[in-house]
Amino acid sequence: MNYVLKVPVAICGVALGFAALGNLFKASFEGFYLACGIISIALLALYTLKFMVSTKTVLRELSDPIGLSVSATYPMAVMLISVYMKADIGDAAQLFWFAGIALHILCIALFTSRYIAKFDWENVHASWFIVYVGIVVASVTAPAFNFETSVGTVAFWFGFICLVVLLIVVSIKYVNMGRCLILLSRSLVFMQLQQAYVLQDMYSP
């Protein structure tokens, strides 16, 4: 059980990766497609078990902007896996798909209330794209459930608009960070040169 408690939230991203990778081989290599689906489900089940065993541990992981944003890969993976499940459980898979969408919307709402309503440049990271642009997975999977003209369209445009906005915001953050690092490195070099001159004066005859 201790092993389960050590499972990081990033494992949800790995599950998402396997689910997406399997979809690429759905038509050409069904065996690989199914294997990726099984691995993805197993990884999500592992993190779900961690949540059930120690909810406080999971909530503590989600208490910072990076942890919370990475957790959005969980509902994204659920949406993709629901397409896998449709072949076996039929229309019931649609319930999992809607559950994934609802959970992702919850992530967006929670993240917005914490880090957009109380905006701070220190909390801006590239992982913000996962939260706001990740909902586009609903658009990609919508045709499997005949919702491409409704849910799919809304999810696509929401994600696209967020992508444009975040490209600007995140770029500003990292450009400014790069400038700060350059200034810091120059300051350190200047300080080292000063120390070198001082030492030279001290030990020169």
Task: Describe every region a protein language model picked out.
Residues N23-L24, Y47-S54, C107, F111-R114, ...:
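A cross-family "folded-core" feature that marks the main globular domain of proteins
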Residues F32-A45, G90-I105, S150-V164:
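Structural signature of hydrophobic alpha-helical transmembrane segments
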Residues F51-V58, V83-Q94, F111-A117:
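Transmembrane alpha-helix boundary signature
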Residues Y132-V175:
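Loop-centered beta-sheet repeat module
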